[in-house]
Amino acid sequence: MATPVPEAVTVPTCWVTAVNGYFYASNAGSATLSEFQDSLTGQLSLAGSTGTDPGTVDSAGTPSGTFLYVQTGGNGIVDEYQVATGGSLTEIGSVIVAGAAGGEGIVAF
């Protein structure tokens, strides 16, 4: 049986996005992304955690698997991350979207 993920990392979770065999859960309550790795057996294991701006709600990965964009509805900010081959995230910037405070929903292409 899989080891439970620590509560501080996961509560509350709003959205999960898959990118190249990794899953990124948006944790609105802790302003983090939980990174999970998929195994060949279908079990997920916690691979790490990355900080975001407050109010993490939705996320979207690019089709190439190179970038992950995270909407933080608290202040209408979109955080931008580069996805490494091993699934780790590097923050590359953030953008304030006018009128997007409290918003939900994001798409990447």
Give residue ranges: language-model regions:
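Blade-level signature of beta-propeller repeat domains, shared across WD40, Kelch, NHL, RCC1
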Residues: 71-109
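Conserved beta-strand positions in repeat-built beta-propeller and related beta-rich domains
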Residues: 25-29, 70-74
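Beta-propeller fold detector
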Residues: 1-7, 44-52, 89-98
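Beta-rich, blade/repeat-based domains predominating
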Residues: 7-23, 50-67, 97-109
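Glycine-centered loop/turn positions within well-structured domains
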Residues: 31, 42, 66, 76, ...
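Generic beta-strand structural signal
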Residues: 18, 38, 61-63, 83, ...
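Short loop/turn segments immediately following beta-strands, especially the blade-tip
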Residues: 1, 35-44, 80-89
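Short, conserved beta-strand edge motifs with alternating hydrophobic and charged residues
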Residues: 24-27, 34-36
